[in-house]
Amino acid sequence: MDLGLYSIDLPFEFATKKEVGIIVPKRLRYRWELILGDSKIELPRLLKDLDSIDVFFHNSLHIYEHMMFEFKTAWPKIKKNGILISDDIHLNNSFIDFCKAVKCKPIILSANLGIIVK
């Protein structure tokens, strides 16, 4: 069983790994892997090596096409009863459109945060 925590982020000229993973608790850092690169390349590559995922959290480029790409790419690997979380859902209709496409009712936690349970 692979219990990993993965982040994909573009390299920042002045950011450190600590700044990028600030939300990762210290007790879980040993399971965390930071992958630097474009998620359009790195996300499919990562998912190819994983059997399934429990949680997918989108918090990268918040334009419609990119959000839909990440949702559509991650969704097939999300386990039954797994969750997809998206930040900044108020910026465009991608989250709601994706919920309709996969026939799942969205859970809107705030104006900018939504969840889908598979």
Over which residues does each language-model region extend?
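S-adenosylmethionine/decaboxylated-SAM
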Residues: 1-118
